[in-house]
Curated annotation (Swiss-Prot):
Protein name: ADP-L-glycero-D-manno-heptose-6-epimerase
EC number: 5.1.3.20
SUPFAM superfamilies xref list: NAD(P)-binding Rossmann-fold domains
Pathway it works in: Nucleotide-sugar biosynthesis; ADP-L-glycero-beta-D-manno-heptose biosynthesis; ADP-L-glycero-beta-D-manno-heptose from D-glycero-beta-D-manno-heptose 7-phosphate: step 4/4; Bacterial outer membrane biogenesis; LPS core biosynthesis
Domain note: Contains a large N-terminal NADP-binding domain, and a smaller C-terminal substrate-binding domain.
Cofactor(s) listed: NADP(+)
Active site: Y140 (proton acceptor), K178 (proton acceptor)
PANTHER family linked: ADP-L-GLYCERO-D-MANNO-HEPTOSE-6-EPIMERASE (PTHR43103:SF3), NUCLEOSIDE-DIPHOSPHATE-SUGAR EPIMERASE (PTHR43103)
Gene3D superfamilies tied to this protein: NAD(P)-binding Rossmann-like Domain, UDP-galactose 4-epimerase, domain 1
Purpose: Catalyzes the interconversion between ADP-D-glycero-beta-D-manno-heptose and ADP-L-glycero-beta-D-manno-heptose via an epimerization at carbon 6 of the heptose.
GO BP terms: ADP-L-glycero-beta-D-manno-heptose biosynthetic process; lipopolysaccharide core region biosynthetic process
């Protein structure tokens, strides 16, 4: 069996889909379906069982026998960069991750988990997996950073796989439940389908991010699991592309336009990553050689999926 925490969420459900694609269906999804809309991410997937997050935490802390487990993909977390409840964030992202990590270490179960590019904070260069380059801007980034630090202390002594991925700007199918935290491509598509002009912040040609298609993220996870590689790795494309490029791809797909530019919100100033670009040196050195989709390629594939039944 494989366990995917956050399996009804965005990246988790795409990992479940990727596992299904290689014939793997003995999957336990762990999630919190308080937000009942997330169930839609699972309806076309094959899983063996579902378990509520709180029941799962109680089981692993108690050391319950959960049978033979081939791997745990730990994607479950609070991923809102605008959430400032530090206790909630640390319980959800830090303590929960430690509990699962030790459960895996005690049983030699491969443990692959979601870190984040938010660990790098507001820097504009050297997005390198090293302590000197890490300075998170918000409590979400700090919770991810602190767990990475915890993992770094344990890695040299670990007898089983521990692998963390610093996800950059992930977009693609199954993110609709994220609301305001969903990708720009998702929101622009909705605006156009509602008969509105697509809206971007003024200066969006200058805001550049490393946008990575979620299918590529799932591929990275499966490759590292199948190859047993440990460490903390950036998971981006190695290319910074502008929000304008995302809008251009959406407008091109819909043959619509023009874009309407709106003022940048005051509350985000100083807390907003203006530039991200993954350094892929470590990822490539580990042996991962697949190419990553460009924004133009990924957005086109994503919009075809989003509009498949419109």
């Amino acid at each position: 069996m494989i366990i995917v925490t956050g399996g009804a969420g965005f990246i988790g459900s795409n990992i479940v889909k990727a596992l299904n694609n290689i014939g793997y269906k003995d999957i336990l999804v762990v999630d919190n379906l308080k937000d009942g809309t997330k169930f839609v991410n699972l309806v076309d997937l094959d899983i063996a069982d579902y378990m509520d997050k709180e029941d799962f935490v109680a089981s692993i802390v108690a050391g319950d026998d959960m049978g033979d487990i081939d791997a745990i993909f730990h994607e479950g977390a609070c991923s809102s960069t605008t959430e400032w409840d530090g206790k909630y964030m640390m319980d959800n992202n830090y303590q929960y991750s430690k509990d699962i990590l030790h459960f895996c270490l005690d049983r030699s179960i491969p443990f692959l988990y979601a870190s984040s590019a938010a660990t790098y904070g507001g820097r504009t260069d050297n997005f390198i997996e090293d302590r000197q380059y890490e300075q998170p801007l918000n409590v979400y980034g700090y919770s991810k950073f602190l767990f990475d630090q915890y993992v770094r202390e344990i890695l040299p002594q670990a007898d089983s796989q521990i692998c963390g991925f610093r996800y950059f700007n992930v977009y693609g199918p199954r993110e609709g439940h994220k609301g305001s935290m969903a990708s720009v491509a998702f929101h622009l598509n909705n605006q156009i389908n509602a008969g509105e002009r697509p809206k971007l912040f003024a200066g969006s040609e200058n805001f550049k991010r490393d946008f990575i298609y979620v299918g590529d993220v799932a591929d990275v996870n499966l490759w590292f699991w199948q190859n047993g590689v440990s460490g903390i790795f950036n998971c981006g494309t190695g290319r910074a592309e502008s929000f304008q490029a995302v809008a251009d791809a959406v407008v091109d797909y819909h043959q619509s336009g023009p874009v309407e530019y709106i003022e940048f919100p005051e509350k985000l100033k100083g807390r907003y990553q203006a530039y991200t670009q993954a350094d892929l040196t470590k990822l490539r050195a580990a042996g991962y050689g697949k190419p990553f989709k460009t924004v133009a390629e990924g957005v086109k594939e994503y919009l075809a999926w989003l509009n498949r039944s419109v």
